[in-house]
Structure formats: C-alpha cells, structure tokens
Design a protein with these regions (language model features):
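Hydrophobic core
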Residues: 12-18
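PEST-like low-complexity, intrinsically disordered acidic/proline/serine-rich tracts
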Residues: 3-5, 9, 20-266
Length: 266
C-alpha cells in the first residue's frame, strides 16, 4: 500500500503551492538494498510496474523541477515569446490560482512527485499517472503520426526500440498546459522526445528533450530517474469541482496571497 497519501484539500494546496513537502517521503523499497537492486535480474525491455520519482538521484546543474532544496537551478533557453509567457505563468502561480481539472500533459505528469504505472501490451505501452488520474498511450506497432493529428493535452506518442533504449516521440500538444509546475510554457509546435533505459532492477532513467522553436531558442534536456515501487498501488486523486471550490475558498481567497484575482496572459 502506498505510504505517501494526500489526505485533504489542504494537503493538495501544499503540493501545488509548496511542492517540496512530499519529496522527502520517497524511499527505498522495504527490504531491498542498493546492492540487491543492482544484482537482481531484470529485462531491459520491461518497464511494467509502478514507478516513483527519485529526487535525491536527479543530476545537479541542469533544469530540474524536483530539486527544490534551495539550489539555484538554471532556466531553459527561452525564446522572447517563451520568456514572456513564463513570466506571465509565474505570476499566475505565485497568485495561488493554479488548481483546475485540465490534464497535466505528459511532461508535467513525469515531473510531479507522484507515481505512475506502466502497463505493457503487444502493440502499445499504457501509462496511468496517479495525480488527476491521467492516461497516456505510447504506440509501438510501427505506425506513423496521423496527417490530421488533433491537438491534445497529452499529445500523441509513438515508441520504438534502439537496442535496449526505448525512444518515444510525442507531438500534437495543444499548448494549454505547463511543462513543469514552475510554469515553463509550450506551444502547439512542441516535440517531446524521451529515451528510456532500465539501469537496474529498480531504476529507470529517462532523458527528455524538448524542441519548441516558438517558446525556446534551442532544444533542451532534462534527465530524470525513477524507482520501482513493487509493493505500492496507485491512490485515487481525481480532480473534482468540489475540490476546486474548497481549494479556492481556503487558498485563493486568503488575505495573505497577493494578486488572487490575477489572470494569466493569453
């Protein structure tokens, strides 16, 4: 059973406004040492199971949404439009107006301190993200991107194998979400590439590359590590109108939060 449970809307607000709280709760699996994980046999082509971000393993010195310990992290290479959008998004987040029921999108789901489950089938890999109950399909049947691709929050993803590396190409985003909780923007032009490698029995490494010439002056990369949580199950964290109403009453209408009526620029 999961040992990291959000028990109230107040806790939800803490995650959204002060996301560092849950990070210390990510732990090694009970009874499994690092040496055990490295020596235990595994299939490099098997990503099935529940995975959780491993904040203490994330590389330093690069853009890293999980590194919230007071370390100054570099920002991505914004284009002028991206810099302006980021500043607008940041004001929106600082004002506390960050809760809605829109899907997080693929990138932000990966960079949220909540687990996700991979379910592998013959022709696709399904991902179930715990937070907001978001789902993603990665097609593995050799198809190409549709000519009439409809923009969507989660995009359209196609995967292929390069040896023991699983390469995922995603496009078709609608540009309505953030890449990260800090408000890094994206547009409908964004292309997201992921390179998955299972490093040992318990460790999954994913290198994310973002190409979006409207928002960024050049492609940029984030490397993330995830730990296999064999004894966990996903909790239910759907977004509901009741949750938004309570969040708004407790947080957005609080006198100590400036700019609670602030709306982001379109």
């Amino acid at each position: 059973m999961r040992n990291c449970v959000m028990g109230s809307i107040a806790a939800l607000a803490t995650v959204l406004v002060f996301p560092a709280v849950p990070f210390a709760q990510a732990a090694q699996q009970p009874g499994m040492t690092k040496a055990d994980a490295q020596s235990k046999a595994f299939d490099a082509h098997d990503f099935a199971g529940i995975w959780n971000p491993a904040p203490r393993m994330q590389p330093k010195g690069e853009v890293n949404p999980l590194d919230l310990g007071g370390h100054p992290n570099p920002l991505p290479p914004f284009a002028p439009a991206g810099q302006a959008k980021y500043e607008s998004n940041k004001k929106f987040i600082d004002a506390g107006a960050v809760l809605d029921c829109d899907p997080y999108g693929t990138a932000r789901n990966f960079f949220t301190p909540r687990p996700f489950e991979n379910i592998q089938a013959r022709d696709r890999l399904l991902q179930h993200f715990e937070y907001y109950d978001n789902w993603r399909e990665i097609w593995m049947d050799g198809r190409n991107f549709p000519d009439d691709l409809e923009p969507d929050y989660m995009g359209y993803s196609i995967g292929r194998w390069e040896g023991e590396t699983f390469v995922v190409d995603s496009r078709g985003y609608n540009g309505k979400q953030f890449l990260t909780w800090q408000g890094f923007p994206l547009s409908e032009s964004m292309r997201q590439t992921e390179r998955w490698q299972r490093m040992d029995h318990d460790t999954l490494k994913i290198v994310f590359t973002f190409e979006d010439p409207k928002m960024y002056s050049k492609p940029w990369t984030i490397t993330y590590f995830y730990k296999l949580m064999s004894n966990w199950v996903l909790d239910a964290h759907p977004c509901t109108l009741a949750a938004i109403k309570e969040y708004d009453e407790r947080i957005n209408h609080a006198d100590h939060l400036p700019g609670r009526d602030y709306k982001p620029e379109k």
